[in-house]
Amino acid sequence: MQFGPFENKDVFAAEKFSQKKHLVSKSVELVLFRGKKAIFLEAKSSIPQSSDDINKIFLPSIAEKLSDTLHLVASDYMKILSERDSLLDPLKGRNWEQLSINYYVVLKGMPKDQLPALHNMFNAYPLLNKLKKIWSPNKSGWVKVINDVKARDMGLIASGND
């Protein structure tokens, strides 16, 4: 799946930046600035079939990506990162105190009826719950688990995008 199309000024390509600079081990694919939202986006083409694998491998990996990306963004905001890289430009001048942090996990081909259970699993996961308390305390269900159909409807991926 490919996200977009978006204007470059609205997208922090977190994964590309972290791979280039080796600053964090994992990161979400991108942070999209849309209105008063900072949308942290991650996409997966599949998920493990067993709930044990989901809980022991999948959820920890996704949670680590969000955590590392939040640290990366915060360190840039606090001017700890002294990087001069155009990939950081979309972070500059953002009024973070006015932005709502949202986390979307897009699961390709996931049937709509399976999304609520996954949504609940993500939002109950301890690390994600802890991050929510710090970064988005007034928001319930801050991790949104959606499929590619919903992502397309929301304008997060292009029509016909596979």
Give the positions of each predicted feature.
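Catalytic cores of nucleic-acid endonucleases
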Residues: S45-M110, L127-S136
